Swiss-Prot record:
Natural source organism: Bacillus subtilis (strain 168)
Protein name: Uncharacterized protein YraL
NCBIfam families: CD3324_fam (NF040785)
UniProt-listed Gene3D superfamilies: Homeodomain-like
SUPFAM superfamilies in UniProt: Homeodomain-like
Taxonomic lineage from the root: Bacteria, Bacillati, Bacillota, Bacilli, Bacillales
S-S pairs: none
Length: 87
């Protein structure tokens, strides 16, 4: 996150309005909610985890036990249960 001087990007009228509420402080202006991305969307991590979870569900349906899956994927038994019993 880079700091930018308000005078460089905001109109003077808006700066005066903001100064009614705060002066000499750093203000963070977040992105609009509509432009937020879900966790892992940019890096591809979300897809990797979704693919892994699909493989775990498939293996469970094909007869592997929760303990076997826990050992194979190096996840806790509780995590495997959450994956296989989720919708």
């Amino acid at each position: 996150m880079a700091y930018v001087k308000a005078t460089a990007i905001l109109p003077e009228k808006l700066i005066s309005e903001i100064q009614k509420y705060v002066q000499g402080k750093t203000i963070y202006i977040p992105k609009p909610e509509s432009s937020h991305q879900k966790w892992g969307a940019c890096s591809g991590t979300r897809k990797l985890i979704d693919d892994r979870n699909a493989s775990i569900k498939k293996a469970f349906k094909n007869g592997k036990t929760i303990h076997q899956l826990s050992d194979e994927y190096h996840l806790s038994i509780e995590t495997i249960k959450k994956i296989v019993y989720s919708k």
